[in-house]
Swiss-Prot record:
Recorded superkingdom: Bacteria
Name recorded for this polypeptide: Transcriptional regulator MraZ
Subcellular location: Cytoplasm, Nucleoid
Statement: the UniProt record of this protein carries the keyword Kinase: no
Gene Ontology annotations for the cellular component aspect, listed alphabetically: cytoplasm; nucleoid
Originating gene: mraZ
Binding partners and assembly: Forms oligomers.
Xref: Pfam families: MraZ
Example of a GO MF term: transcription cis-regulatory region binding
Source species taxonomy: Bacteria, Pseudomonadati, Acidobacteriota, Terriglobia, Terriglobales
Family of this protein: Belongs to the MraZ family.
SUPFAM superfamilies: AbrB/MazE/MraZ-like
InterPro entries: MraZ (IPR003444), MraZ_C (IPR035644), MraZ_dom (IPR020603), MraZ_N (IPR035642), MraZ_sf (IPR038619), SpoVT-AbrB_dom (IPR007159), SpoVT-AbrB_sf (IPR037914)
Gene3D superfamilies attached to this UniProt entry: Transcriptional regulator MraZ domain
Amino acid sequence: MFRGNHPTRVDEKGRLKLPADFKRRIDEQYGSQFFITSKDGKVAEIYPLQEWEKVEQKLAQIPNMNPAKKKFLDRVNYYGQMVEMDAQGRVLLPQILRESAQVTGDVVVFGMQSYLEVANHEAFKQNMELNPMTAEDEQALAEFGL
């Protein structure tokens, strides 16, 4: 399980060096293949291939004519790309996603349980300020026992 956050950088070639804590977990559990994508173009989502295959298994249960499935697949395939981690623990973020999510230079990598999320540090801070946790959010989470 991935948790916490680690500030890092995306180099001029678009490579993200995976933070040591996350890389250790990846080495122990997953291997070097990933599917990198986004549902909104605002953040990059890095799925170990085994975790992405779980998403695909769930998608396979949804009829192909379902409009939500089509929208989801359109987006994740538009931004998505299979990548392999190199010997230095780096993954190449797809150019279209780097540009859309502005994930160049200083970024932050969040553990999102089964995948990693990469965000532009400044844009993420602004989004948190514009969208604070509300009483409604807390109530919705309380319904799940959180």
